[in-house]
Amino acid sequence: MHVTSPLVQSHVVACDLLVPAWNYLNRGHHVTIVMDGEAVTAFRLDGTGKTPLDRVTTLRSDLDDLAPLLEVALPAVPKNFGELYRILAREGIRIVANEDVIQAFQIGPGELDPAVSLIDGSEVRRIITDVDAFLPYPVK
């Protein structure tokens, strides 16, 4: 999955990526989400250690949908999208960010959510060209 648009512009944008990633993982696929362009800013930590995604709360309707998807009780569903992305990373989805774009947005070494790994531009190109399936996001 290659993500270039800002993830924090709406609940729909933030959530739409999670469901297919989770479904592909649960079907036994190796999933890598490449954060590129403005998408990298969603994972920038502020002075309190929070990202913009930590400030996008999970809607009640999303909680109802995510509980069975994550196979957890409703109270255990994360209340924000930052934690949801961290769960994806812990469960085996590789979340990477284009190092060149990180530098362009002047995001320092300690300012990126630890769930995200940095890769250089050549690795981004390799990932998006050497795959069995490629899902650009947003889909137009």
Give the role of each language-model region:
Residues M1-C15, G37-G47:
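Short, glycine-rich nucleotide/cofactor-binding loops
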Residues H2-L7, D64-A73, I107-E111:
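Short, basic, glycine/proline-bearing loop/turn elements
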Residues V12-G28, I33:
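Histidine-anchored nucleotide/phosphate-binding helix
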Residues V31-G37, I95-E99:
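Short internal beta-strands
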Residues G49-L53, D113-V116:
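Short, hinge-like loop/turn segments at secondary-structure boundaries
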Residues T51-A97:
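A glycine-rich helix N-cap at a beta->alpha junction
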Residues L74, V116-S117, G121-K140:
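Glycine-rich, aromatic-bearing surface loops/beta-hairpins
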Residues Q103:
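C-terminal binding/interaction regions
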